[in-house]
């Protein structure tokens, strides 16, 4: 990826949760301030840095240096990269390492990595010694705009994604936009799907801005920081109103009911990154909304066109290996969606669209129209 165009002073977004509220600090090179911010937040604390091998190569030394500069002790806990670490075995590894390192309740866990590391480290922090505070240092675009904010932590089960976990808010989020320069184009695009999601579900003006500025976001600088800050503000506002996802927060799952099933169907593998699953899932949700008469075909096409223009998959046939390996059939995908966290009394709940910028929660969706819709999309050869 090319060098950033320009950059400005850090942006701070507040997650307003009373005495459990925290700041998201966004900007280029803000990782350098990690030590001073932690020292002010938790004087005398030791830290354990949970990261994966790939991130450790690029950013562990710099993170430890920022802590060393103010005399903060840090101990690295390195897991394998990829969704496979977000498992019972990965959780056991991190928990046992935290206990062995004698990390106490006045110390801090630092999650240095993408969504997998953040979810895993946050969940481990929530259960070791009945709760350790933790700091999110997200190193992927997806993690900076989504998974590091709002306190959802957890691991996957063989039955599905994110089925074991807890709500556990961080005490600080440091979103350094410079670290995104080390992402592959595919990783960056996958994170962009979550950025586009915020426009699609609740802010048409932001979506239009993304349509006009997505190339500048890729290049970096102030457009990238604006996109991240706008996304974080949108999520922070919803989390402040509905922390435990009893209502409005479910809107943030636009694209995720279909997307999570597709991730499970591809074995949580590199065939389909999470953000890519969300992209395909959002388009499917929009098309299903149009079939139900809720959304215009033009609006569904607008969403699909923008995601495709960025380089994201928008059709089931775009999933890597579809032609060679195929995908689960409609019945198998329905079975995977039946494990979705939004299912109530066995009935499916979908996040659908009435317009670009207006999502709604659709309860008690009949399964047969969904199964028929998926069967047609799987058979689509266009």
From Swiss-Prot:
Record-listed E.C. numbers: 4.2.3.4
Record-linked InterPro entries: Dehydroquinate_synthase, DHQ_synth_AroB, DHQ_synth_fam, DHQS/DOIS_N, DHQS_C
Enzyme category, top tier: lyase
Gene3D superfamilies from the UniProt entry: 3.40.50.1970, Dehydroquinate synthase-like - alpha domain (1.20.1090.10)
GO (cellular component) term, any one: cytoplasm
Cofactor note: Binds 1 divalent metal cation per subunit. Can use either Co(2+) or Zn(2+).
PANTHER family assigned to the protein according to its UniProt record, in alphabetical order: 3-DEHYDROQUINATE SYNTHASE, 3-DEHYDROQUINATE SYNTHASE, CHLOROPLASTIC
Protein role: Catalyzes the conversion of 3-deoxy-D-arabino-heptulosonate 7-phosphate (DAHP) to dehydroquinate (DHQ).
NCBIfam families in alphabetical order: aroB
Name of the protein in its database record: 3-dehydroquinate synthase
